[in-house]
């Protein structure tokens, strides 16, 4: 079951679902979603002259990105074909009986802005800011302003709560993240990690 605005408000008031700061609930809470705003931090992928990135090499992954912080009132220009990691302004905490889906806003989609490449899911138990995988599929640069509504979060109720939710017990590598996070895929078992 997808939560309606009334369901979302009830869960927020109960405190088991967290979206904060929720500065303007009348605007941000939609009929079946919550609009999330763009944060100030971005990780830009460098145009590197390297043959490839090896996902199991933390150094190669971290050397490939550079952090940019946009000051209040500033803009981040997303050029055609570019891919950057951004973050939501809000921090979320998803209870064990819900799953959250990150979706783009249709108004930005009509400007060819995509807010997630593949990671559109927040597992039960996830806590932290949400990293956005932003790309411009259009032919013109688009100015993104921190604080603008950039995405929406919908919530689906699970039939039963997760037995092993995302979090410390599972060693979840993105739990509690603040700001955009580069890939930590080198922590996966197939690359010698423990996850």
Curated annotation (Swiss-Prot):
Residues 174-184 have a biased composition (Polar residues). Its EC number is 3.5.4.13. Keywords: Hydrolase, Nucleotide metabolism, Nucleotide-binding. It catalyses: dCTP + H2O + H(+) = dUTP + NH4(+). GO terms for biological process: dUMP biosynthetic process; dUTP biosynthetic process; nucleobase-containing small molecule interconversion. Residues 159-195 are annotated as: Disordered. DCTP binds at residues 105-110, 123, 131-133, 152, 166, 173, 177. Pathway: Pyrimidine metabolism; dUMP biosynthesis; dUMP from dCTP (dUTP route): step 1/2. One of its GO terms (molecular function) is nucleotide binding. Catalyzes the deamination of dCTP to dUTP. Homotrimer. Belongs to the dCTP deaminase family. This is dCTP deaminase.
